Amino acid sequence: MNRKVILNKKQIENIIKRLSFEILERNLSINEICLIGLEKNGYTIAKRIEKFISENSTKKIFTIQLKYTNRNFKLSKEIEKKQKNVILIDDVLKSGKTIIYAIKFLLDYNMKKLRTLVLIDRSHNEFPVGLDFTGMKLSTTLEEHITVNLGKEESAYLN
């Protein structure tokens, strides 16, 4: 398999740190933020952002996992009524289909704000998804695939 590393562990750490600072800067007057990570990598990114923000501010921050299979979504725990500032997080945005269905699901909750964050935006949107926070924008062909590994050998690669 021919694969090209596009982000190494240090680069991923730096992007997550920068995204965390952006979240803090854009939410100066907000005391509580709810991070909702799409299962697996989106949730892992959300937990890392939560850790960074907790260590660097006094904001209350909560992380919830959003599990999904075939357009069926389920939160790992309910969003409390007072948690109205939500950031939906995923690792890679390709067509926007997963995020648009997740947004549709989350609109049933009473939120003041819903923002989106991705580690890598592939620029192949087929759905009208606006991103509020983007780690990296990378134009690829439709045949190429980006894989993000946030495990032991952390990297993002193109194949």
Pin down the residues of each PLM region.
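Internal catalytic or translocation cores that form aromatic/hydrophobic pockets or channels
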Residues: 84-107, 111-113
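Short, well-ordered alpha-helices that flank and scaffold nucleotide-derived cofactor binding pockets
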Residues: 21, 25, 47, 51-55, ...
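Short glycine-rich phosphate-binding loop at a beta-alpha junction
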Residues: 28-39
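Short, glycine/charge-rich flexible loops or terminal/linker lids adjacent to PRPP-binding catalytic cores
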Residues: 16, 47-85, 97-100, 126, ...
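A polyampholytic, Gly/Pro-enriched intrinsically disordered region
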Residues: 78-90, 135-141
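Residues at the starts of beta-strands that form the adenosine-phosphate
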Residues: 32, 60-62, 85, 113-116
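PRPP-dependent phosphoribosyltransferase catalytic core
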Residues: 26, 104-159
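Active-site-facing substrate-recognition patch
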Residues: 1-30
